[in-house]
Curated annotation (Swiss-Prot):
Region (Disordered): 1-24, 77-132
Catalytic residues (positions): 277, 294, 347
This enzyme's EC code(s): 3.4.22.-
Cellular compartments per GO CC: extracellular region; host cell; membrane
Superkingdom of source: Bacteria
Originating organism: Chlamydia trachomatis serovar L2b (strain UCH-1/proctitis)
Subcellular compartments: Secreted; Host cell; Membrane
Composition bias type Pro residues, residue spans: 86-105, 114-130
Database matches in Pfam families: Peptidase_C48
Protein task: Effector proteins function to alter host cell physiology and promote bacterial survival in host tissues. This protease possesses deubiquitinating and deneddylating activities.
GO biological process: protein deneddylation; protein deubiquitination; proteolysis
GO molecular function terms attached to this record: cysteine-type deubiquitinase activity; deNEDDylase activity
Protein known as: Deubiquitinase and deneddylase Dub1
Residues spanning the membrane: 40-60
Length: 403
């Protein structure tokens, strides 16, 4: 029996170490070296990334303004002094002094120039004249307070007048003419729908006088009949009439008859007066006279031009409707000034008021007796308007009175 110590089992032989190949770096120091290299590379990468982010948010000019960048002078602990350049001709700026006597303040100098010591007693300098500045007061003259007071009074006056006298349309004007016919049968109440205009009033006057001459001769009339009057009644009116009140509707914008009628329709649809205006031409057949009335005096054209235009019409009427005694038609411009002051809606009422004055006394100029004050003048007109509106309440709508 064999003992354990003398066992016959074989183990692998251990090869002997080669003494000719020495070990340079052991495993543990090598790992430490790799870690140091990795940390150094990571630190360099972080620095590069940080600088890149700084360059993204700051331009090169911003980096130059930093005290640690691009400085050629040696760094000192004193902060750089910022000096403001001042033009040489200007006097030195006066620096306010505190209550306690401080050290003398150095004068402001140009950059890169040593500041000169401030003299203890500077010579007196003449004050420089200030440069004139263009302000609102220089550009626009000051408006006296009285002007604002007058403007306020004018506005208040206009409101009072507009409340006194309303705007008259063609309907109320025609009713007023019908009422005047009951007072003065020689007046023919010509329709105002559609009214005459500055472009066709001459033709309408000539046509009416030709129809009157035909009626007196017993001939049929050639002109168009009124809308709201029978043929027999119209012939009776023409036979007995001695005065034609031709109301004209005027607007400064249209330049033709068609445009005028279109503008009239548009304003009627809107229910607005706009810039429209009523004019009156009285054809006094008995006195052989044309009387023109414009409450705004020269709203349509200068009175001299209108007078020449009416004189041309008068020559035509002398041929169309000659007088037995050979008397010619004369022309008169009634208004010598603006009658309709401080009011934009009373033109129709003023035309009716002037016609009423003319019917009462055609040879007396009632415009000379008008009050100077516009409010008092329109108060008198308001009394006439109220009387007319009360008188025409019982008249039928759009119907001629029987002649």
């Amino acid at each position: 029996m064999l003992s354990p110590t003398n066992s016959t089992s074989k183990t692998a032989p251990v090869p002997p170490r080669d003494s000719s190949k020495p070990v340079l770096i052991s495993e543990e120091p090598r790992n430490q070296l790799l870690q140091k290299v990795a940390r150094t590379a990571l630190a360099v990468l972080l620095v590069v990334v940080t600088l890149g982010l700084i360059l993204l948010f700051y331009s090169f000019s911003d980096l130059q303004s930093f005290p640690w960048c691009c400085q050629t002078h040696p760094s000192t602990k004193e902060q750089p002094t910022i000096s403001i350049p001042v033009p040489l001709p200007s006097p030195p700026l006066a620096v306010p002094r505190p209550s306690t006597p401080p050290a003398p303040t150095p004068a402001i100098s140009r950059p890169s120039t040593p500041s000169a010591p401030k003299p203890s007693t500077p010579p007196p300098l003449l004050p420089k004249a200030p440069k004139p500045v263009k302000t609102q007061e220089n550009l626009f003259p000051l408006v006296p307070e009285q002007v604002f007071v007058e403007m306020y009074e004018d506005m208040a006056r206009r409101r009072i007048i507009e409340a006194l006298v309303p705007a008259w349309d063609s309907d109320i004007i025609f009713k007023c003419l019908c009422y005047f016919h009951t007072l003065y049968p020689g007046l023919i109440p010509l329709e105002t729908f559609p009214p005459a205009t500055i472009f066709n009033f001459k033709q309408k006057i000539i046509s009416i006088l030709e129809d009157k001459k035909a009626v007196l001769r017993g001939e049929p009339i050639k002109g168009s009949l009124p809308i709201c009057c029978s043929k027999e009644n119209y012939r009776r009116h023409l036979q007995g009439t001695t005065l034609l009140p031709m109301f004209m509707w005027y607007h400064p914008t249209p330049k033709t008859l068609a445009d005028t009628m279109q503008t009239m329709k548009q304003l009627a649809i809107k229910g607005s007066v706009g810039a429209s205006h009523w004019l009156l031409v009285i054809v006094d057949i008995q006195a052989r006279r044309l009387v023109y009335f414009d409450s705004l005096y020269n709203y349509v054209m200068p009175p001299e031009d209108m007078k020449k235009d009416l004189q041309s019409l008068a020559q035509q009427l002398d041929q169309v409707y000659p007088a037995r005694n050979g008397q010619k038609f004369s022309v008169k411009i009634a208004a010598k000034e603006v009658i309709q002051k401080d009011s934009g809606f009373s033109c129709g009422a003023w035309c009716c008021q002037f016609l009423y004055w003319y019917l009462r006394d055609p040879f007396t100029d009632a415009l000379n007796d008008l009050p100077v004050d516009s409010v008092e003048r329109h108060e008198n007109l308001a009394s006439f308007v109220q009387a007319c509106e009360a008188a025409v309440q019982d008249l039928p709508e759009l119907s001629w009175p029987e002649a």
